[in-house]
UniProtKB/Swiss-Prot annotation:
Record keywords: Cytoplasm, Methyltransferase, rRNA processing, S-adenosyl-L-methionine, Transferase
PANTHER family: RIBOSOMAL RNA SMALL SUBUNIT METHYLTRANSFERASE C (PTHR47816:SF4)
Catalytic reactions on record: guanosine(1207) in 16S rRNA + S-adenosyl-L-methionine = N(2)-methylguanosine(1207) in 16S rRNA + S-adenosyl-L-homocysteine + H(+)
Entry protein name: Ribosomal RNA small subunit methyltransferase C
Primary location: cytoplasm
Native source species: Buchnera aphidicola subsp. Cinara cedri (strain Cc)
Gene Ontology MF terms: 16S rRNA (guanine(1207)-N(2))-methyltransferase activity
Length: 343
């Protein structure tokens, strides 16, 4: 799972700088994409627009209010965007991730489309000109504190080749293909290794992997326990692509689906596993972790188990109700803790 959640209006510097420059783009047909501030879902400051999103949780929120004004991209559908006159793109902290998605969008729009990119300095906004120097001419048109707004003219449209963004590595005879923004993009992380190491006994039944990312947790379990039935979920389109393709690459069968934690989970499972995200960009956010724990009982069979790995700096008192939850620490090191919660 990518470490991304929707921003609130109170912390959206990007929205404030766009509102300040509203006259620049208010009357043009507009594509709004990237990490979109939640205020854009509530206030229509642009009359004719379409949201182009890569995160399922954001898609679900937009769908409730603007069902005709949203496209959810999962790399399998080519959408006609050439009629739009401008693109407003909200930057992520990951340079390779925004290069992936902005390149994809540029390959589908008109050459006359005007590009606006907005983001904070810590997200790499000031390096945007260098990253797209072969295709776009950028000019900074406004800035406020640590947030900047750039306008770009298209010199030529890039061709999008997904394979150019794929990183491949091998761990314990498991081949992993990953895309920018997917957790575990460069290599398997230490937390996932620790969680996998706790599965030293035979596992049976149905397994749910929340925030599957590359799919490494489920793949490692299925390699050791070939009779288990695995379901992998995520909110990020690139993560779903990775999970699906890595199952195939490692000769495994499983279900892979979009779900905002438990939003599209209807069955009960013998085991739920997760290495949940605890950050939004550079800030700690434990909402997802809390929801996974709190609602796990509804999706576990009798005597079922939730097994998750969390950073050791997180206080268990903050995320677990000791009076209502039966849990124990299975393994711990300086950086991570593996927790088992039984139903």
């Amino acid at each position: 799972m990518n470490k991304t959640v929707i921003k609130t209006f109170q912390i959206s510097k990007e929205y404030k700088i766009l509102k300040k420059n509203f006259q620049l783009f208010k009357n043009k047909t507009t594509i709004i994409s990237g990490i979109i501030p939640s205020v854009f879902l509530k206030i229509n400051i642009i009359k004719r627009f379409i949201f182009y999103v890569n995160y399922f949780n954001l898609y679900l929120k937009i769908l409730k209010k603007n069902s005709k004004n949203v496209i959810f991209n999962n790399f399998n559908h080519k959408n006609k965007l050439s009629s739009y006159k401008q693109l407003i793109f909200f930057l992520t902290k990951n340079k390779k991730e925004f290069k992936l998605h902005l390149t994809f969008l540029l390959s589908h729009i008109s050459k006359t489309c005007v590009i606006y990119v907005v983001g904070e300095k810590k997200c790499g906004i000031n390096s945007i000109s260098k990253i797209f120097s072969n295709y776009l001419i950028f000019k900074k048109i406004d800035y406020a504190r640590t947030c900047s707004l750039y306008k770009a003219k298209i010199m030529k449209l890039p061709k999008f080749y997904l394979h150019k963004f794929i990183n491949i590595y091998i761990w314990n005879n498991i081949t992993i293909q990953s895309l920018p923004g997917v957790f575990g993009y460069k290599k398997i992380d230490t937390g996932s290794k620790l969680l996998i190491s706790t599965f030293n006994k035979k596992i049976n039944g149905k397994i749910l992997d929340i925030g599957s990312g590359t799919g490494i947790l489920s793949i490692a379990l299925a390699k050791k326990n070939p009779l288990i039935k695995i379901t992998l979920t995520d909110i990020y389109d690139a993560a779903i692509w990775c999970s699906k393709n890595n199952l195939i690459k490692n000769n495994l069968i499983g279900k892979v689906l979009f779900s905002d934690i438990y939003s599209h989970i209807k069955k009960r499972y013998d085991l739920i596993i997760s290495n949940p995200p605890i950050h939004y960009n550079l800030k700690i956010n434990l909402k997802i972790l809390k929801k996974i724990i709190k609602n796990s009982k509804k999706h576990l069979k009798k005597k079922g188990e939730l097994r998750i790995v969390i950073s050791s700096f997180i206080s268990l008192k903050y995320i677990i109700n000791f009076n209502k939850i039966n849990f124990k620490i299975l393994l711990k090191n300086k950086s991570y803790t593996v927790i088992q919660i039984t139903n």
